[in-house]
Swiss-Prot record:
Keyword Methyltransferase: no
UniProt family annotation: Belongs to the TrhO family.
Protein species of origin: Roseobacter denitrificans (strain ATCC 33942 / OCh 114) (Erythrobacter sp. (strain OCh 114))
Protein name per the record: tRNA uridine(34) hydroxylase
Gene for this chain: trhO
Ranges of residues in domain Rhodanese: 121-215
Amino acid sequence: MFIIAALYHFTRFENPAALKPALLELCKAQGVTGTLLLAPEGVNGTITGSRAGIDAVLAHLKALPGCDGLEWKEAQSERANFGKMKVRIKREIVTMKQPDVDPRAKTGHYVTPADWNALIAQPDVAVIDTRNDYEVEIGTFEGAIDPKTRSFGEFPAWWEANKHRFHNKKIAMFCTGGIRCEKSTNYLLGQGVEDVFHLKGGILQYLEDIPQDQSTWNGACFVFDNRVSVGHGLQEGPHLLCHGCRQPILPADKKRAEYEEGVSCHKCFDQTTSEDKARFRERQKQIELARKRARA
């Protein structure tokens, strides 16, 4: 059984690139795979491996300067959910492109999953999903507003264009594991919004804690590993990933004329050029050759 750990922490790294070699070496030595992002504002990522391997990496991360409060969520899987280990150096651990946003200074009020349903049922509360459009498409909370953003960096512009809709409203925000809400609630507070709340632990914590018969969540939650989606109890969902556009699809979608493994699906067929598709076919060919060599 493999452990999947989704983690993040906002802190100040003076030289994140200097942290990469030892972290990458440890992950490889422990057989841990996945992706970790290091930036001046902290660390973010998802990794998978054995219990001992994950514990070793988490201990290493918690020992980094200012990281003793590292947040992570765990789930179990019968397979490794990443092919290799990557440690990347970025400007931000979650890209918002708002240099004045700093979750270390202040964030919205945390709301536990146990209290979330009561909060979002209040008539003076506006519930905003801060995730990308393709994530919202497969699942969200009842009555939640979908900003229809293609990336988190589009959220500030959406808020600026729509903030008049929320005059005298309390704002409740949610995302997959909590990291985007750390930034979005700080951003709204900086814009003068007084009552800002966010779901502690994100959707993943809610799906783990709240029984389905008491839940206001509809659908599945997109996750950034080979599970693609999860439902209540963090059970693996039905979705697959189109490797042409990295968006979730259902098994039935593979029967559509637009689907070609590793190349396209009905969501992206008209969005890519013939040159793109040729490049994706070559990539898929190399993947299949690598699989054959691994089985030989």
